[in-house]
Amino acid sequence: MGKSVVVLGAQWGDEGKGKIVDLLTDRAKYVVRYQGGHNAGHTLIINGEKTVLRLIPSGILRANVTCLIGNGVVLSPSALMQEMGELESRGINVRERLLISEACPLILPYHVAMDHAREAALGKKAIGTTGRGIGPAYEDKVARRGLRVGDLFDKEQFAEKLKNILDYYNFQLVNYYKVEAVDYQKTLDDVMAVADIITGMVADIGAILNTARKNGDNILFEGAQGAMLDIDHGTYPYVTSSNTTAGGVATGSGLGPRNIDYVLGIIKAYCTRVGGGPFTTELFDEVGQEIARKGNEFGAVTGRPRRCGWFDAVAIRRAIQVNSITGFCMTKLDVLDGFDEVKICVGYKLPNGEVVDYAPLAAKDWEGVEPVYETMPGWKENTFRVTDVDQLPVNCLNYIKRIEEVTGVPVAILSTGPDRVETMILQDPFTA
């Protein structure tokens, strides 16, 4: 019988999901994106060759896998064409193996313009978006005014709808934000130039997935960003605009929630965050700088430096609760090699002195919160590219075990390097 496995970030994104999805896709027939857009940056290194995928599921690098983009994804035609071009130039047949829901909202130039205008207006209080129009596109979806992939089938009606919505956006851009209007004709021409390519890949994603379940096929759901960036359960308002948690799988793909068999939460051996928002264990000293240097902590999409800190078990507990995480995959374990001591945040000290073991929901409630640490001895031995768990240093194993104890979730996979072979699978999600 086939399994449906969800791979999602359990922290603030950038946990290394792309590599793990790629690793597990040799067991799957379908790989599905169900939320987010091209603000995701999934980096894969295979035989030394680096690939960064932003929109197309990571399974595209496996010849026997069909990739699906579900209705929960906001789709940029220009980003899709660029990514397809890059892959096809390397001999990867994207058009025969990628299927797209007609219900995907489209990201168009006016969304990007609005994203930039709003961030600029917020100044120092900016959310720290990627500036790719993700939020405005989701707004249009909820407001029921957005254009969707299915609208591309009727070009005449699309042109009319585009005119109306562009008038709406340009009025705000010009009169409120005092920036240039978005050109209607260029926007229309650019979309129409690729419309037939996109509509040629349209399919009923929900029907495909439900048929796959009946046929006993393995399905892998590829999450983007991280659980603590979820629009509802993250550190609002410093969040993304979609449901990054496991609940987004059902609503963003059309497969019912009872058909999810395993939720694999990806965690770094430490924590990182990009952009604004609370980060209790953030380090501002030389240790934080060393983690950033060794971990090469720069965003795959934006190139922005990531904030670094110790592992936060308190925040992870909320991610476990919201996602029903079955097992962890711990990545970048090797980054902690060489430290005299390592720390795990096991509680939050509130401004009134009370120590709690749960994370606040709203960003404002994190103000003045201090981490309560357990300090453990570090390890000097090298764990980079180790592929046998018995070869890991004792202190490293103790660190992993302690994280399992304080979270109540087993570590199913360990990653000690960027390549897909630099991995230890302790519990296979498709056979567990």
Curated annotation (Swiss-Prot):
It is an enzyme of class 6 (ligase). Mg(2+) binds at residues 14, 41. Its EC number is 6.3.4.4. Keywords: Cytoplasm, GTP-binding, Ligase, Magnesium, Metal-binding, Nucleotide-binding, Purine biosynthesis. The active site is at residues 14, 42. The keyword DNA-binding does not apply. GO terms for biological process: 'de novo' AMP biosynthetic process; IMP metabolic process. InterPro entries: Adenylosuccin_syn_GTP-bd, Adenylosuccin_syn_Lys_AS, Adenylosuccinate_synth_dom1, Adenylosuccinate_synth_dom2, Adenylosuccinate_synth_dom3, Adenylosuccinate_synthetase, P-loop_NTPase. One of its GO terms (molecular function) is GTP binding. IMP binds at residues 14-17, 39-42, 130, 144, 225, 240, 304. GO terms for cellular component: cytoplasm. Pathway: Purine metabolism; AMP biosynthesis via de novo pathway; AMP from IMP: step 1/2. Binds 1 Mg(2+) ion per subunit. GTP binds at residues 13-19, 41-43, 306, 332-334, 415-417. The keyword GTP-binding applies. It catalyses: IMP + L-aspartate + GTP = N(6)-(1,2-dicarboxyethyl)-AMP + GDP + phosphate + 2 H(+). It comes from the Bacteria. CDD domains: AdSS. Substrate binds at residues 300-306. Coiled coil: none annotated. It holds the Pfam family Adenylsucc_synt. NCBIfam families: PRK01117.1, purA. Plays an important role in the de novo pathway of purine nucleotide biosynthesis. Catalyzes the first committed step in the biosynthesis of AMP from IMP. Homodimer. HAMAP family: Adenylosucc_synth. This is Adenylosuccinate synthetase. It comes from Mannheimia succiniciproducens (strain KCTC 0769BP / MBEL55E). The gene is purA.
